[in-house]
Every structure is written in structure tokens, then in C-alpha cells.
Design a protein with these regions (language model features):
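N-terminal accessory beta-strand-rich subdomains and adjacent acidic, glycine-rich linkers
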Residues: 1-82
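A mature extracytoplasmic/lumenal domain signature
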Residues: 12-14, 63, 100, 141-143, ...
Length: 249
């Protein structure tokens, strides 16, 4: 926000096989910003590529209101057209669910008397979502064991916690015009995640679990790479393409 009638967004488009841009205060001062690329682990190399190589578009959007920035088609027009002929399964939507209660300590991720993602509690969120036109209900901590890559980590993201009847919850959601959103916490162990994601996503497709939220809580991806460096950008692209194979949002 520059003033009451002037809003500016600095962003990028067609970020493909390249490091994400970040902005920081310029050493020159005078309220100016400097652009910098998220580097590879050695902190010196930003992008590894052979020429010719396309760089992302850098965008500046200007509008008289925040809504004007959202309505702009600039970034969409600078991205390549969608590769998929049929995108009817893509469903932009809102979601609520078992999440914040875990962060404030009201409920717990893992099993026990305070476990948040139990059948009764998730159905309570489904009722709320149905009454408020919210399309999905997320349940963090719905599967057995902890996040992937931790002691006792889940090997699959498929087996539900002892106090969650997954079939009952998914069916109840559909009966009320809501869908269940599965959570996958990788703990940044993305190489391990790659080994199992076909099995996981196939299970979701077969059981009408059409959306996921993937977490990357931890230090660096695969204990090495910055989240928004070139390696991370390519990993996220691979993940999106993999979920698309199974018609998962």
C-alpha cells in the first residue's frame, strides 16, 4: 500500500527451472528495494543452467485497490498455457479444519486423549464447513505416527490414526457436500516422499480424496536445499505434476 488509492505488487511469472526472487532493502537507502535470487547450498551459485535458458518474468502490478491486484490477468498471461486439455478436476476452493488448535496446544497431533484429528472432531468441522459453504476440511495429524523423516515417522500417509475412521469421515463429508483434504507432512524429507508418493496418491484417487496439503516443516529440503532455490522450485513443479497424474488438487 502506497496510499489509500495506490497499491503495488512486485512478483514474477513463469518461474521454471530457476531460483525464486526475493526482495530486500537496498543498501542505497531511500526506500528502494534490491532483488536477489535464493542460492544453492554453497550460497554462491544461484542458478545452474546451460544457455540458452529462459529466465522468469518480473512483474509490477499497480491498482487503486487490493482487489484490483487480484483481478489482474498479468501473471496468468505471462505463464505458459495449461498443458492439460481437461482440467475439470481442478477445484479452487476454501478449507477449514484441524490445524490451528494443534499450534496453540488445545489439541495434539499424535494420538491420545487430546488428539485433534479424531472421527467426532473432524465430523464437527465438516458440519461447520457445510453450513458456511466451505468446500474442504483439512485434518492435520489424521494418519498414524509422526511426520515423515522423524522418529516413528509414517511410512505411507495412508493408515489413519486409531481414533479416526477414515471411510466414515470421507463418506460423511460427501453426504454433506464437503470433501476431506489429506495432509502429508514430509518434514522436508522429500527424497523419501518421492519413493512413496505414487502409492499414496493412487490410494487417494481410489478413495475419492481429491485434495492434499503437503507440509515441508523443518530446515532445508532433503536437509540441504533452500525451500525457494532452483532445486526447490523444480521439486515443487515435480510434485504438482505428480498429483495431476492422479487428479488431485
Amino acid at each position: 500500500k502506497i496510499d489509500d488509492n495506490l497499491y503495488i505488487s512486485l512478483y514474477e511469472a513463469d518461474l521454471t527451472d530457476y531460483a525464486k526472487k526475493k526482495k530486500k532493502n537496498s543498501r542505497q537507502g531511500n526506500n528502494t528495494l534490491e532483488s536477489a535470487l535464493v542460492p544453492w547450498p554453497d550460497e554462491k551459485v544461484k542458478v545452474k543452467a546451460s544457455t540458452p535458458h529462459k529466465t522468469p518474468w518480473r512483474t509490477i502490478q499497480i491498482a487503486s485497490s487490493p482487489g484490483g491486484l487480484i483481478e489482474s490477468k498479468l501473471i496468468q498471461n505471462l505463464n505458459d498455457p495449461c498443458d492439460y486439455e481437461n482440467i475439470d478436476w481442478i477445484d479452487p476452493a476454501k478449507y477449514c479444519g484441524v490445524w490451528w488448535s494443534l499450534h496453540i496446544g488445545k489439541e495434539t497431533w499424535s494420538g491420545g486423549p487430546q488428539h485433534g484429528a479424531n472421527t467426532k472432531n473432524v465430523k464437527r468441522y465438516i458440519d461447520f464447513a457445510a453450513k458456511n459453504d466451505i468446500e474442504y476440511v483439512l485434518a492435520e495429524g489424521w494418519y498414524k505416527y509422526g511426520p515423515l523423516g522423524t522418529k516413528g515417522g509414517s511410512p505411507e500417509f495412508i493408515t489413519p490414526a486409531d481414533d479416526l475412521d477414515l471411510e466414515e469421515v470421507v463418506n460423511y463429508a460427501h453426504e454433506n457436500g464437503v470433501k476431506f483434504m489429506a495432509y502429508n507432512e514430509t518434514g522436508c524429507q522429500v527424497e523419501e516422499y518421492r519413493k512413496i508418493w505414487d502409492k499414496v496418491f493412487q490410494f487417494y484417487e481410489e478413495n475419492d480424496m481429491t485434495a492434499i496439503k503437503v507440509g515441508h516443516v523443518g530446515g532445508r529440503l532433503a536437509d540441504k536445499y533452500h525451500h525457494h532455490g532452483q532445486w526447490g522450485v523444480n521439486y515443487y513443479q515435480e510434485l504438482i505434476e505428480k498429483t495431476a497424474q492422479y487428479h488431485i488438487d
